[in-house]
């Protein structure tokens, strides 16, 4: 947790003043029982109305100053805690953006969301309560004991005993509940995971009529979380009854012993009332301290989870900002004996892959599900690093390019068409912030998207809702293709990004890309044989191995895997027409 405290930087003054003002409030609070004692022993005893009114005015003044001090402390602590949370959230978001796909795969999206939201909120609340109560509660306990000792050293022993007993009760309850709270936080991760899976895959769930099964799985996970929270809540609920029972018994003992002391003339009635008030102050402070410890314990657990992400350093280092000279005449992409295995996977996803793509070529990539098509493309983009072998673009190892230059060099259209809230123009300018309307329209024409964009009110200024939900699947795919074309990359990757397009639009798209993107190397990843058959050469993958690398006609004669794919999608007559 101490590693996270660097995020308080910039709010040191507020973090210092908050506990100081809380201690100032505590000082005034400690004087209240003495003023009440003086009212009883002097004002009421002597029937001195003026004295009573004067002391009542003093009580109001003490309350007003205490309130002002408390509000000031609350403002300072809230400012520091909110600033701390904002800085931590910003840095965590930035850090997650630096992680490679390997680290993100290992951590998982649901737990990242939980740590970015719930865990940081827990840490933020812990900081807020710490600034307010860490010094105040012990100060009140110690101050009340000193005040009680100044009134009656003998009865102070009772105070010390009660303080120890209440502290032991609080410690015992926390010792049991803290691990349960930690497990509950992990349970929240699992609930978040199931929720995300079901919302993202809602159509699939309904298509297979799995609503009841998914509901049953969610109910089971949610019930487990509920049981953990109930268990912690039931045990925590014992704290107030037990502590109040002990303190009330102590008050009874104090009244009995105090009455004896009053009869003996060793104490006044006002002093006994003051002792009872000090005991109440000790109880409330210990309970607040217990709340603080529970909150801090949760914050520590959440802080460890946040730190776990911050301490996860990417294995994929950016070589820097230096620009490499790109030789346009060199091979656009070259794989040499590349092998890659996903983290914790039992077998390689790609094995001994070797091929060459020249500038201006269109390369088709085809294979069955799980054959390694997307993995191969991810290595071109350097979303992952190969375990063995080398990947080179334009005569430079892909690892030598800075991430910024590599992203300009390679335009990617992923399988899932993702648009962002804003306008069509905003989305088109993601990779090229200074792109003109002419450049955007040119990209839209190539992507077969210009017609429906012109039909939108506002055209380029037409709004895009969250995830592009106000566009159809085919429209989203065409817009993401246009977005990748705007900066005119030297390599364009279409990773099964035309799956929602009809055959005519798909064919028009491939023709436009071929004719309008002179010198651009295009990788078309698809499960459709029709989408890749006109490529200059086609890479055929089967279970992570490259089993074919040739034009369509040659593969039909030499590659059984490719032939099976074609015959599974086309009749023999249709296949014959493609030769």
Where do the protein language model's features map onto the residues?
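ABC-type nucleotide-binding domain
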Residues: 326-579
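Helix-loop junctions and hydrophobic alpha-helical segments within the transmembrane domains
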Residues: 92, 96, 205, 306, ...
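Transmembrane helix-loop-helix hairpins at lipid-water interfaces of multipass membrane proteins
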Residues: 9, 15-72, 76, 149-154, ...
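Helix-loop-helix
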Residues: 47-54, 147-161, 231-305, 309-310
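Alpha-helical segments in transporter systems
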Residues: 2-5, 13-34, 55-59, 74-78, ...
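Transmembrane helices of ABC transporter permease
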Residues: 10, 14-27, 129-183, 254-267, ...
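An intracellular "coupling" helix at the cytosolic face of ABC transporter transmembrane type-1 domains
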Residues: 10-13, 98-102, 118-127, 131, ...
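Conserved catalytic Walker-motif region of ABC-type ATPase nucleotide-binding domains
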Residues: 96, 218, 306, 335-337
């Amino acid at each position: 947790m101490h590693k996270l405290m660097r995020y308080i930087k910039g709010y040191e003054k507020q973090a210092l003043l908050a506990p100081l003002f809380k201690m100032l409030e505590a000082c005034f609070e400690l004087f209240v029982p003495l003023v009440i004692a003086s009212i009883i022993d002097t004002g009421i005893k002597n029937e001195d109305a003026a004295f009573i009114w004067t002391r009542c005015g003093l009580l109001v003044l003490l309350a007003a100053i205490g309130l002002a001090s408390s509000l000031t402390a609350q403002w300072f602590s809230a400012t520091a805690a909110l600033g701390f949370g904002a800085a931590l959230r910003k840095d965590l978001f930035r850090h997650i953006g630096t992680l490679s796909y390997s680290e993100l795969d290992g951590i998982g999206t649901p737990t990242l969301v939980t740590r970015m939201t719930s865990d940081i909120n827990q840490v933020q609340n812990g900081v807020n309560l710490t600034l307010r109560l860490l010094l105040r509660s012990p100060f009140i306990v110690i101050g009340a004991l000193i005040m009680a000792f100044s009134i009656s050293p003998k009865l102070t022993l009772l105070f010390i005993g009660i303080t120890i007993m209440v502290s032991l009760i609080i410690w015992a309850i926390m010792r049991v509940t803290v691990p349960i709270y930690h497990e509950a936080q992990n349970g929240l991760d699992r609930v978040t995971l199931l929720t995300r899976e079901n919302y993202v895959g809602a159509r699939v769930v309904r298509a297979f009529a799995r609503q009841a099964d998914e509901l049953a799985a969610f109910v089971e996970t949610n019930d487990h979380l509920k049981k953990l929270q109930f268990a912690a809540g039931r045990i925590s609920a014992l704290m107030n009854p037990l502590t109040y029972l002990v303190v009330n018994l102590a008050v009874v003992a104090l009244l009995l012993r105090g009455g004896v002391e009053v009869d003996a003339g060793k104490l006044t009635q006002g002093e006994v009332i003051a002792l009872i008030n000090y005991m109440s102050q000790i109880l409330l402070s210990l309970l607040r301290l217990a709340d603080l410890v529970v909150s801090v314990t949760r914050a520590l657990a959440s802080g460890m989870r946040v730190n776990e992400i911050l301490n996860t350093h990417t294995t994929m280092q950016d070589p820097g900002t230096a620009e490499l000279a790109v030789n346009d005449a060199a091979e656009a992409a070259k794989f040499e004996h590349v092998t890659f295995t996903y983290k914790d996977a039992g077998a390689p996803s790609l094995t001994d892959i070797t091929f060459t793509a020249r500038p201006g070529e269109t390369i088709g990539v085809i294979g069955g599900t799980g054959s390694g098509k997307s993995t191969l493309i991810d290595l071109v983009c350097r979303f992952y690093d190969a375990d063995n072998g080398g990947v080179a673009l334009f005569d430079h190892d892909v690892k030598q390019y800075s991430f910024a230059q590599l992203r300009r060099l390679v335009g990617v259209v992923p399988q899932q068409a993702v648009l962002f809230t804003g306008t069509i123009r905003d989305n088109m300018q993601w990779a090229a912030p200074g792109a003109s309307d002419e450049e955007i329209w040119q990209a839209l024409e190539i992507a077969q998207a210009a017609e429906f964009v012109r039909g939108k009110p506002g055209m380029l200024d037409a709004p895009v809702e969250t995830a592009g939900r106000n566009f159809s699947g085919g429209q989203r795919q065409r817009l993401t293709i246009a977005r990748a074309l705007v900066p005119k990359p030297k390599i364009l990757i279409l990773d099964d990004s035309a799956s929602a397009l009809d055959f005519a639009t798909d064919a028009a798209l491939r023709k436009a890309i071929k004719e309008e993107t002179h010198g651009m190397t295009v990788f078309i990843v698809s499960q459709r044989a029709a989408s890749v058959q006109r490529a200059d050469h086609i890479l055929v993958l089967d279970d992570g191995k490259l089993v074919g690398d040739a034009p369509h006609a040659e593969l039909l004669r030499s590659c059984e895997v490719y032939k099976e794919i074609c015959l599974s999608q086309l009749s023999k007559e249709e296949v014959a027409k493609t030769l």
